[in-house]
Amino acid sequence: MLLVLTGVTAISVALLAYVNELTKEPIAQANAKTLSDAVSAVVPGFDNDPIAEKKTQEVNGVQYAVYPATKEGKFIGAAVEATSMGFGGELKVLVGFDAEGKIIDYSLLSHVETPGLGSKAADWFKKGNKGDITGMNPGEASLTVSKDGGKVDAITASTITCLLY
């Protein structure tokens, strides 16, 4: 009996390792395309390759990936990738800023937030929606939720997710 269980376990591990190896490259390519599409969406109009020019910036002990966007050699903005823990787990967001530091747009790259609650963050803060943060400059005024005295409308029952923005 023990030999059978050991054999089944060994075969299962080998199959999982094989499938992992088969899917590693397609997953990496899909993630790269998602990032490329998101950078194009949050900082439109550049003619360089922001992903190839990626820089890492540390602020208050936190590392951020910065993708500078230029047009004809002139800096027009940047996409900043940030990762934080939401209520349900890791939340990865890409925020586009113009040259003056105002938010152009954002893209929620990945999350494991509660469907119907925290997952609304993918659109909640977009232009024209209730929690619209476009045009705001976090360098001039903190992006805090209205219940804490800020100007950002939080998603009902998802304040933790909103605080991450």
Language model segments and positions:
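Flexible, solvent-exposed loop/hinge segments and secondary-structure transition points
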Residues: 1-164
